[in-house]
Amino acid sequence: MASTDTGTDAKKDGSSAAGESQDVQDTHDLAGLEAGLDALESAQAGRTPLRETLIRKALPPITAVALVLVVWQLLVWAEVAPDYKLPSPSAVWDEVTNAWRQGTLLDYIWTSVSRGLLGFLMALAIGTPLGLLVARVKFVRAAVGPILSGLQSLPSVAWVPPAVLWLGLNNSMMYAVILLGAVPSIANGLVAGIDQIPPLFLRAGRTLGATGLRGAWHIVMPGALPGYLAGLKQGWAFSWRSLMAAEIIASSPDLGVGLGQLLENGRNNASISQVFLAIFLILLVGIAIDLLLFSPLERRVLRGRGLLVTR
């Protein structure tokens, strides 16, 4: 009887060991499969010819710009509007070359870009801890959450008159308008990202001792990164629009001539070509910031999470 029990136990132990061995083997197989897929994707990405990459990424926007220029020139030739309402592409290009020769073109751009980036960094420093606080503290969310949503929907231009009355015509007024426009977007983006973190991650972090600031740094922020990045992109868009509204409305010689002031000067001088120049420069800066800063960050985050789809 004892030998039978011993044999049964041995069989159970053998079966258990075999099962564990099979589980380990399955785990190794799965890890190997994932590594192989990652290597395959990397190899495919690495084998993409430069010519194909340029055609796939550069040709569509170049074609779109060329099409816009052709349609624009056709409208000018058709005289659908007088010259003082619709300038020709060559007239706008003349404005570009004149500003370049006078040495003012880069000054226009840098005046606005430096303000916009500095204001965005200040909004980032305020909106990030505010978003963490709103997302993690129920009372703060109930009290401040609706206000942030309301501020985000409020047009930034509405803040320019009170900012001028409070602070005067200076750079502080510009930064105040940027903060009021961008902070709610950054905070709400982080809140949305934190709300999308699986509760299992948070419980696992608490079990392993990641609480307080450690939990926020190692669990919450990495888990909320996709939503947070979307909030940052929207925050920059609000920063840039807020700055343009402030520069257009609150103009002063002491503030220098930024792109918004250039647009307003064109209106005051009835120079539609200068107005178009300012609009194109504002658009160009927005596209450049997205392509050089936010798009690489977004691709890196998605690639690190296995969510990047290559086409």
Task: Name each model-derived stretch.
Residues 154, 194-200, 204-224:
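Short helix-to-coil transition segments within interhelical loops
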Residues 176-180, 212-246, 277:
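Transmembrane alpha-helices
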Residues 165-166, 242-276, 281, 306-311:
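Glycine-rich helix-loop "coupling/hinge" segments at transmembrane-helix boundaries
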Residues 118-148:
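Transmembrane-helix boundary motif in ABC transporter permease subunits
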